């Protein structure tokens, strides 16, 4: 899944 909002934050999994 994603990590936090927005889901396309740096260092997070690209979910967009």
Swiss-Prot record:
Keyword Acetylation recorded: no
- Tissues showing expression: Expressed by the venom duct.
Keyword set for this entry?
Amidation, Disulfide bond, Oxidation, Secreted, Toxin
Residue numbers carrying Methionine sulfoxide: 9
Any idea which residues bear Cysteine amide here?
16
Annotated GO molecular function terms are: toxin activity
Disulfide linkages recorded for this protein, renumbered to the chain, are 2-16, 3-12, 8-15
Q: Which residues form a coiled coil?
A: none
Where is the protein localized?
A: Secreted
Listed under GO cellular component are: extracellular region
Domain topic, free-text comment:
The cysteine framework is III (CC-C-C-CC).
Family from the record: Belongs to the conotoxin M superfamily.
Name listed for the protein in its UniProt record: Conotoxin SI.13
- Originating species: Conus textile
């Amino acid at each position: 899944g994603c990590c936090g909002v927005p889901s396309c934050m740096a260092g997070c999994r690209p979910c967009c």
